[in-house]
Design a protein with these regions (language model features):
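Membrane-proximal helix-turn-helix segments that form the acceptor-binding/catalytic region
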Residues: 124, 136-139, 143-147, 172-191
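Nucleotide-activated donor-binding/catalytic signature segment of Leloir-type glycosyltransferases, i.e.
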Residues: 233, 276-303
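Nucleotide-sugar-dependent
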Residues: 246, 298-304, 312-333, 338-351
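Nucleotide-sugar donor phosphate/pyrophosphate-binding loop at the beta->alpha transition
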Residues: 149-152, 160-183, 220
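N-terminal subdomain of nucleotide-sugar transferases
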Residues: 1-75, 79, 258
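Carbohydrate-associated surface elements
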Residues: 59, 197, 214-217
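Conserved donor-binding/catalytic core segment of Leloir-type glycosyltransferases
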Residues: 229-255, 268
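Acidic anion/phosphate-binding donor-loop and adjacent secondary structure
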Residues: 203, 217-233, 247
Length: 418
């Protein structure tokens, strides 16, 4: 792949940003996966543009389902990082990932959020952002909105849809989550979703507030195309959480098929999470000598790490594919690399593939088809280069930090995301 690092975007601030703003979110720095990188970048972008920015969040615990070293005792519950004031509260990670564990985790955390308000630790704000998941964050954030202020709820996952698809909880629990989603979101002033299909699902749920579609964003200055390392074999890269909803079992099966198509290629799984040991055991049982595991790369070396992948992977379980637009997809496009994803017809990724032609999709749970798509790209370096350039161009026009910041600022100030 060519090195296009000289053609980076200049940072530009929007015409106006709120003087003060609050983000209520379970996910934030230093968590390296999930929604945390995107929320961290959004908050720091507001701070860099002049907003007095506060984040109310959990002690970092994802992926891995344990509070990070140095945070459990509360000594880092009040920090200022990159101009953003970070306020954290007691966190009990959801061991096991079931519905009961998640409810305990979210109940304790959001009770702490409300206590922070009651004790005067975090005040009401005229401009409030919240992140779903958790829908409890959205409900709590409504309490932090000052009279006459605006609250914008950012929906990355639709929890009732994902919970039902992944078998978490029974019918009564799902009905309760749907009712909470509908009520909490209808009390926000505006809602942001990542894709048109997500907007459609919220409308079907009974959400009637204005909904803007703003794709996942990335700091396109920090994440940019870099040349691949010259001394490595052809590399297929997955980077992210080792969690159930990623459907990583199909990646191992894909690697088994790829071994006969491209015996010189390696499949590098870089990440951490609750499924790590299970995945390693499965890879060993299948005799996958072409699969390697590695930890997530530090944020400051993200562009370098992404450059290692000739072809990237964005797997999803089919049941949850309609409810989420993976942020990692946009990050890969910013790095000028193509990827192969699993998605359903009409889903957010399927529509984006048709729009920009910068990646390939295969049906979920079809590892042989996924392996063929990966091999086809490995065999066509010129095609990979062209797809990478198209993906990068789309990010610069639609998903860069400056483009997205202007839209969020408009929603907070006057309800206009144009």
């Amino acid at each position: 792949m060519p090195d296009d690092s000289s053609a980076r975007l200049a940072r530009t601030a929007p015409a106006a940003v709120p003087p003060r703003a609050l983000l209520v979110a379970m996910s934030y720095w230093p968590e390296p996966a999930g929604s945390a990188p995107m929320m961290t970048d959004l908050a720091t972008a507001f701070a860099a543009a002049g907003t007095d920015m506060t984040v109310l969040t959990a002690r970092p615990n994802y992926p891995g389902q344990r509070v990070y070293d140095g945070y459990a005792d509360g000594s880092q519950d009040r920090l200022t990082v990159d101009g953003v004031r970070i306020e954290r509260t007691l966190t009990i990670p959801p061991k096991g990932g079931g519905m009961k564990a998640r409810l305990i985790h979210e109940g304790v955390l959001h009770g702490g959020f409300l206590a922070a308000q009651g004790r005067g630790r975090v005040a009401r704000h005229a401009a409030v952002l919240s992140l779903c998941p958790s829908i409890f964050s959205v409900a709590v954030a409504n309490r932090f909105r000052a009279p006459g202020g605006r609250h914008v709820a950012i929906v990355h996952d639709i929890q009732s849809g994902l919970a039902g698809a992944l078998g978490m909880g029974g019918g009564a629990a799902l009905k309760a989550i749907r009712a909470l989603e509908r009520n909490a979101l209808n009390r926000a002033d505006a809602i942001v979703v990542l894709s048109e299909p997500m907007r459609d699902v919220l409308r079907e749920l009974g959400v009637r507030r204005p909904i803007a579609v703003i794709p996942p964003h990335v700091d396109a200055d920090a994440v940019h195309p870099r040349p691949r390392p010259a001394d490595q074999p052809p590399t297929v890269l997955y980077s992210g959480a080792f969690a159930r909803k990623q459907g990583l079992e199909q990646v191992l099966e894909m690697a088994r098929h790829l071994k006969s198509l491209r015996p010189d290629a390696r499949v590098l799984l870089r990440g951490q999470g609750g499924l790590e040991e299970e995945l390693k055991a499965q890879a060993a049982a299948l005799g996958l000598t072409n699969v390697e595991f590695a930890p997530l790369i530090p944020k400051e070396r993200l562009a370098e790490g992404l450059a290692e992948g000739d072809v990237h992977l964005v797997p999803q379980r089919p049941e949850g594919a309609a409810f989420a637009m993976p942020g990692k997809a946009v990050t890969i496009l910013a790095a000028g690399r193509p990827f192969v994803c699993t998605c359903l017809p009409g889903s957010a990724l399927a529509r984006l593939e048709a729009e920009i032609g910068a990646f390939l999709s295969t049906p979920p749970d079809a590892p042989e088809a996924m392996a063929k798509a990966v091999a086809d790209l490995l065999n066509a370096p010129d095609r990979r280069t062209a797809m990478g350039r198209r993906g990068r161009a789309w990010v610069e026009g639609n998903a860069s930090r400056s483009a997205v910041l202007a839209r969020y600022a408009g929603l907070l100030l006057n309800g206009d995301a144009a």
